[in-house]
């Protein structure tokens, strides 16, 4: 029987005073917009933006850098802010972005103060023309850290969480290129899957769809079922980006990476076919060819991607299964000291 997933609302207590107050978790609640303006020096430095929010450089505790995410003011988007706030207040994991503070006027305005990650996001790092190329050992470590973050929200939170928008631009990198999953505004909280009510019109269903071009699970687009399998599909696309260095979706060329990779993915899923080293190297990011990397590690990454983006949901592994596979089959990770996360 299909289970309906309802976004669970959590009570976030807030003491109203004229000064910022500290939650028991160490998260600071800012009680006036003046506090927010002070944190950002009156919003003097914009460092990022999305469809529904802008991100400003901020100073936390007077000196430490932080990132302030300000949501567009509207009642509907305030609900998105509340969802993300409620989730981040519950999450503590080394590979999930840390919430430092927040402002909530309980009506239409909201802001999240997040840890600052100096290396930006994974998409920017992979697509950058900089001479500083993200090395293979960093790429496999990012894959493991990301899937451990997904495993945490899928299996180790109560209630469980489906992120809903796993993509490389939602993977932030710290100074050591360790990754942090961010942006929980599209998350679903509760059971592992949901089915849209059968009485919902196609137009209404379309409005509720989440995801990003190149990353959205085709099964979700067809059925409206948001599940852990959807997150694993997005993870599989990110792995393809890590291996190939290509973007998930090129608006200029109208190409999706999953379509480019489809012939190779089909060969990998056909257990009777032994993929040649030449085919693997043709798909590999050419900036990595001079590295002395183990081609079997590349094959492992591609095999993981293939099962994660499979059209057969039964073939898609859990995050825990992928983490185990990477740890067992990619020797580079043992040298980096990567292991099972919290």
Swiss-Prot record:
GO terms for molecular function: ATP binding; protein serine kinase activity; protein serine/threonine kinase activity. Its EC number is 2.7.11.1. Keywords: ATP-binding, Kinase, Nucleotide-binding, Phosphoprotein, Serine/threonine-protein kinase, Transferase. Pfam families: Pkinase. The active site is at residue 165. It comes from the Eukaryota. Coiled coil: none annotated. The modification Phosphotyrosine is found at residue 220. GO terms for biological process: response to wounding. ATP binds at residues 47-55, 69. The modification Phosphoserine is found at residues 169, 201. It is an enzyme of class 2 (transferase). It catalyses: L-seryl-[protein] + ATP = O-phospho-L-seryl-[protein] + ADP + H(+); L-threonyl-[protein] + ATP = O-phospho-L-threonyl-[protein] + ADP + H(+). Residues 41-336 form the Protein kinase domain. SUPFAM superfamilies: Protein kinase-like (PK-like). Transmembrane segments: none annotated. Belongs to the protein kinase superfamily. Ser/Thr protein kinase family. This is Probable receptor-like protein kinase At4g10390. It comes from Arabidopsis thaliana (Mouse-ear cress).
């Amino acid at each position: 029987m299909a289970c309906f997933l309802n976004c669970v609302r959590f009570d976030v207590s807030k003491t109203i005073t004229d000064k910022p107050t500290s939650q028991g978790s160490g998260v600071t609640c800012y009680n006036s917009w003046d506090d927010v303006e002070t944190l950002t020096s009156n919003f003097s430095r914009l460092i990022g933006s999305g469809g529904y929010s802008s991100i400003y450089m901020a100073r936390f505790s007077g000196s430490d850098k932080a990132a302030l995410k300000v949501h567009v003011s509207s009642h509907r988007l305030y609900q998105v802010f509340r969802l993300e706030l409620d989730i981040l207040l519950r999450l503590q994991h080394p590979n999930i972005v840390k919430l430092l503070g927040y402002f909530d006027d309980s009506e239409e305005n909201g802001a999240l103060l997040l840890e600052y990650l100096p290396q930006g996001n994974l998409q920017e790092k992979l697509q950058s023309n900089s001479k500083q190329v993200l090395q293979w050992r960093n790429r496999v470590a990012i894959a493991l850290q990301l899937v451990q973050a997904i495993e945490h929200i899928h299996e180790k939170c109560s209630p469980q969480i489906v992120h809903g928008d796993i993509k490389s631009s939602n993977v932030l990198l710290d100074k050591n290129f360790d990754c942090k999953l961010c942006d929980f505004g599209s998350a679903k909280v509760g059971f592992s899957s949901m089915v849209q009510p059968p009485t919902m019109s196609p137009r209404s269903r379309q409005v509720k769809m989440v995801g990003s071009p190149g990353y959205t699970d085709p099964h979700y687009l067809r059925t409206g079922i948001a599940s852990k399998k959807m997150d694993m599909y997005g993870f599989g696309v990110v792995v393809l980006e890590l291996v190939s260095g290509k973007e998930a979706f090129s608006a200029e060329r109208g190409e999706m990476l999953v379509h480019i990779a489809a012939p190779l993915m089909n060969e990998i899923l056909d257990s009777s076919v032994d993929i040649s080293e030449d085919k693997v190297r043709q798909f590999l990011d050419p900036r990595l060819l001079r590295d002395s990397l183990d081609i079997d590690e590349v094959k492992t990454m591609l095999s993981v991607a293939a099962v994660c983006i499979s059209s057969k949901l039964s073939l898609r592994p859990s995050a825990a299964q992928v983490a185990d596979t990477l740890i067992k089959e990619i020797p580079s990770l043992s040298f980096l000291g990567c292991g099972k996360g919290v």
